[in-house]
Amino acid sequence: MIEDEINAVFEHFDGSNIEIWWQERGHHNDPDKLREVIQNEIFRAEAAGADTIMLAYGLCGNGAVGWHSDSTVLAMPRFDDCVNMMLCTGKRDRRNYLSAGCMYLTGGWSRDEGALLTMLDNYLEKYGERKGKKLMKLMLDSYTHVTVIDTGCYDIGPVNDYADECAKQLNLQKNTVYGGNEPLAKLITGEWDEDIIVLDPSGHIREEDFDFTS
């Protein structure tokens, strides 16, 4: 989901001593599954002798709660989810950066198997055009905009085209907001501040670790 934003960090940073383990898309849709999969990856990294494990995730519907390592430092962004993470373009100054009614898109999300137009195609194939569109409309009832987050880390042209088609097919308005990958850059480069959770061995990630205090 955030592959473009992670790769952009390495364009300006020598991360030759960092091994990236990409994960399958879609785990964030099932927090319990996400918790299990990433915890197993933490155990695997421990066994491989990692001295630090950097987790490029947010709280993700409490999917991160309980992650732990007995022998290795864990570090991860102090954000509820990847959307908030990419909407924060400087130091974190509040917990929630989302705007009501917005369905957010980036390069990664437009390519995801659960992307809007893929979902629509699946609904149309399964239920037919009339019922499929009605079900999508009900599912998106609280949304008014499809919003592209321009993180500067991907070719925005195809994503704008995708967003235009989403807006047309789903009767939404389309707009663009500026974002970035600063929290991920802090995580990867080791420039850890209050925006990064750093957990010593034997500690467990808690929901309250993601609270914001000014």
What annotation goes with each model-predicted range?
Residues G49-M85:
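Hydrophobic/aromatic-rich structural module bridging two neighboring secondary-structure elements via a short loop
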Residues M1-D14:
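N-terminal basic/disordered segments at the start of proteins
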Residues P31-A45:
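Glycine-rich, highly charged phosphate/nucleotide-binding loops
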Residues D70-L117:
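Long, charge-dense
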Residues E165, N171-S214:
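C-terminal accessory domains and tails appended to enzymatic cores
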Residues A100-Q169:
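Active-site rim beta-loop-alpha module in soluble metabolic enzymes
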Residues E46-C60, T106-L120, L199-S214:
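Extended, charge-rich low-complexity interaction segments
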Residues S16-K33, T176-Y178:
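A short beta-strand-loop structural module common to alpha/beta enzyme folds
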